[in-house]
Amino acid sequence: MAETPQPYLIFVFFVFTLTVATQTTGSVKCKTSLLRYPFGFSDGYPIRFNCSEITGEAVIGEFAVQEVTNSNIYVEIPPVCKRNIRKIEQLFRENLAPSKLQNIILVQGCKKQNKSSNCLIRNKFVENRLNLSKCKSPVSCLDGATTTTADVMSLGDVVNGSGCKYWFSSISQSQVSVNLGRLKLDWWLKGSCSNTTCSENADCAKVKLDDGGLGHRCTCREGFSGKAFTVPGGCHRLVYKRKGLHKLVVLGTAGILVGVLVIVVLIATYFFRNKQSASSERASIANRLLCELAGNSSVPFYTYKEIEKATDSFSDKNMLGTGAYGTVYAGEFPNSSCVAIKRLKHKDTTSIDQVVNEIKLLSSVSHPNLVRLLGCCFADGEPFLVYEFMPNGTLYQHLQHERGQPPLSWQLRLAIACQTANAIAHLHSSVNPPIYHRDIKSSNILLDHEFNSKISDFGLSRLGMSTDFEASHISTAPQGTPGYLDPQYHQDFQLSDKSDVYSFGVVLVEIISGFKVIDFTRPYSEVNLASLAVDRIGRGRVVDIIDPCLNKEINPKMFASIHNLAELAFRCLSFHRNMRPTMVEITEDLHRIKLMHYGTESGKFKNRSEIDMKRQQSFPRE
């Protein structure tokens, strides 16, 4: 992504000629702004704007009008620290008010946290991204969607009910963009549609006001253009000139077209209702993601065009892999940075929950062996996540020889196990409340240029109980990947840090054996790798599960370290969680195994460096 000052939210500030679909006799102009009835710059118009002598723009109070449509007015709200909340009163008028939907008011100095929208913009974002260094008060979100049953916000709810002193800015949202510094207003004329002043061939839309009253808007029907209100001219039918159509052909096909039209209308009605439902769901999703993005200043926001360009329009040649929840593509931004972009397969609530969860968790932790979330994108109900690119794929791909590279040496396997354990231990012990990954598996362990491991895919992760509480687990429905799932968690629905320990134990067995976790070509009692490993290790038959690819380099010291790792895996795979070690204990055991195998710390790095160099000389980086 180019280094421009917009990595969090899309800043959209328009200054252009303003027009509306409802026409009237003549128009009024204020330098750069052209308006038509019912909008104007004098008392003779129902909805009056002022004309800025400095910019030549239409303004409402002190706020510039950016756009006027058949139903809305968009105004610019520049981010300002400690702007009095009562400044918003300028946008509550007899014929206009902020829309209840697709709007979020950003406020400061609140006595209590607003419950309607759980989002908070950190001071770091305000200071660094908006260049407002003196803005010390945190910014929170006031979502107008729950304030009233009307179509517009209530001034009393915003000014008095919010308990906030300052109005920082606003956010308006559409299906394809999130706009900071922009507020959407609804407009109307007095009276209900029953007392309409709409012209012939115009439809009336009612507007429910916050005081219980009604307003209305007039719009020319589809196929008509002109003046929707009762002023001279009215709405007239649009005339399209068509050449080369014979009159008799038109008459002959008219009957057929009428029949087809009836069928089309019925089908269109069905799909339109479904589309409305989907559109409403997308709007709800967008509002949720919007708050998450606004509340996580460490997560940049990319546009869909940037994502599309980076992946070459999601070309198959850039596809890195696909899973249950989405497809991952390799991408490259203009600054030549390589990234991995996950495109979710589904747009349902479950998928969105996982996106929100991953944004929250990855933006709150940092560790060299956790994959970094570089940004995200939301376009028309479809979320995308942008990660750092891991050129050597996944641990699973190497253990299953899917990349055409030499088998991983024992030194590399042991190093990957140690790094992965360190990352999980960090999530369990260095974060409060702890984070339980819930999907530790070899395909979620990525490898960088130097084969350092990084854990990915936090969509199923959950926060544990804070260390201030004595509870050892949380109750939740089991989720994860078959073969890696803690059997006791599956039995009693109690998730704890020991659930990740079990999954990591399965990964250790994969590292030793190179076997698939679930393999139906094995005997029935050995389909599950964990069951097979527990049986063989318990009977002292570790040699039965050692990867044949390791036979060429095996020696007494290496054989001893494999046995020690197998015994550690055996403890991790205990059915009862209380019998399993903690991740901190596992990292300590792995450190001892490394020292036994390498002899010294310096020898460890020398051996790894030599192995990595040989691999990189034989096989070019992807």
Curated annotation (Swiss-Prot):
Class of enzymatic activity (EC top level): transferase
Q: Which residues form the signal peptide?
A: 1-21
Residues on the membrane's Extracellular side span: 22-247
Gene Ontology molecular function, alphabetical: ATP binding; protein serine kinase activity; protein serine/threonine kinase activity
Annotated glycosylation sites: N50, N114, N131, N160, N195
Q: Which InterPro entries match?
A: Kinase-like_dom_sf (IPR011009), Prot_kinase_dom (IPR000719), Protein_kinase_ATP_BS (IPR017441), Ser-Thr/Tyr_kinase_cat_dom (IPR001245), Ser/Thr_kinase_AS (IPR008271)
SUPFAM superfamilies referenced in this protein's UniProt entry, alphabetically: Protein kinase-like (PK-like)
> Record-annotated residues binding ATP?
L320, G321, T322, G323, A324, Y325, G326, T327, V328, K342
Gene3D superfamilies the record matches:
Phosphorylase Kinase, domain 1, Transferase(Phosphotransferase) domain 1
Reactions that this protein is recorded to catalyse? L-seryl-[protein] + ATP = O-phospho-L-seryl-[protein] + ADP + H(+); L-threonyl-[protein] + ATP = O-phospho-L-threonyl-[protein] + ADP + H(+)
Q: Establish whether keyword NAD is in the entry.
A: no
List residues in topological domain: Cytoplasmic: 269-622
Coiled-coil stretches are none
Which GO cellular component terms, listed alphabetically, does the Swiss-Prot or TrEMBL entry include?
A: membrane
Q: Tell me its EC number(s), please.
A: 2.7.11.-
Please explain the role this protein plays, according to its UniProt record: Serine/threonine-protein kinase that may function as a signaling receptor of extracellular matrix component.
- What protein family does this chain belong to? Belongs to the protein kinase superfamily. Ser/Thr protein kinase family.
| The protein, known as | Wall-associated receptor kinase-like 21
Q: Which organism is it from?
A: Arabidopsis thaliana (Mouse-ear cress)
Name the gene behind this protein: WAKL21
